Amino acid sequence: MSVETSIANGIAEIVLDCPPVNALNSTEWLDLAKNIDHLSHNDEVRVVVISAKGKGFCAGADIKELQEDSTKIADVNDGCWKTARAIHVCNVPVIAACHGFVLGGGILLAGSADLVLATEDSYFGLPEIDRGALGGGAHLSRLFPLQAVRKMMFTGKPISAKRAFEYGSIESLHSDIHSLHQAALDIAEDMASKSPIAMKLAKKALNQIEHGDVDEHYKSEQTFTLELYKSTDSQEARDAFVEKRDANFHAEE
């Protein structure tokens, strides 16, 4: 099972469980979006906590699926956009409890959430530039300052959770996954005790006054992802990643 969902005391927990690195395929992204949307309209749910099992939070999209069928890029983009938007417009607050790696689509989950907590050993990044892809900049910009975002996008290098905490990008740091989970639940319990209508309107108000529309920005960003995906360099990057070798890029007109 790639995603586990449970509801107790007003708190819905979504746990990613897709070994080995919680990289989701196109169907799993679409299912996750539907799951979050369903929870958003469930009167029993007052807050959602997203976490993961395994070595890390989420490594993004399943590159091997795209390698086997390049036409899946449209479905992957659609699923990623719908998932990110479902979190952003969810009627209740969404908390992302991150451990280990938070990469690619993992940035979409964290960057769409209302609150991010992380373990001290976790790190955040968009390695897409080395995978023949783009995307995630809109949500990365909700987490980090401009210079950090551009360096991360252009180099593919991640930022540590400790650096992210210094930026104010995450709410708190925790020594291990157990203390992380407990901290997320403690905050969730506090939120769940508030007036449902007040929380719903508070989130809508915050989304409304936020600079720009992250959902539209991400949709626009995906047009460049598709443009890059059609290039020979994009295919070469994916081939090199799967074959575990250095890529050989060429200038294109």
Question: PLM features: what roles do these ranges have?
Answer:
Residues 4-6, 38, 44, 51-86, ...:
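Glycine- (often His-adjacent) and acidic-residue-rich active-site loop
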Residues 1-9, 43, 156-162, 181-182, ...:
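C-terminal alpha-helix plus adjacent terminal tail
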